[in-house]
Amino acid sequence: MNPIVINGTVLCDNITGIPRYVYENVVRLDKLIEGTGLDVRIAYRDDGRPIHLPELKNIRLVPLKSIPYFYNLAVLPAYLRRTHAFYVGLASDMLLTRRSVVVLHDIRPLVLDTDKGFFRFKFWVHCLSTKWFAQRVFTVSDNQRHLISEKLGIPERVIEAAQQHLSAEDKRLDAVLGQLD
């Protein structure tokens, strides 16, 4: 089976907000996949900052040398192609691969007039990459699901409002893992 690669670069940041979401899901996923034989990896931009994770038993860390911005545009996509990996973006990540799912937490920077300049442009490009490449999009609420569909033109059938965690009782995990075979 091809590897599943999660972008873990946000785990080098302070663990609040979206990095906390990624951290909690990775720690839970490490326990959930025990004994399944799945090859799950956390790829992250190795720029000298430590990655904030406990010791993982079933998920492998893959540091990739890169400069900022070049990581998501070239280094990570090249690694995904080289390893024939399925990509999981848990942090509203920019992606340049079709074999992927992404969590787009919200699109507030595109809807509200509070964010300006480069950040807003960068976020818009990230959202467009989601529209063009992601097979499935997950978000935090039904309201965000409708907003993402309306503002980005992504069909609602590929967007799912999902709980903010995985649990052993969550049967959707079995469905997702079944699609990877």
Predicted regions and their residues:
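Carbohydrate transferase catalytic cores enriched for Leloir-type hexosyltransferases
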Residues: M1-D181
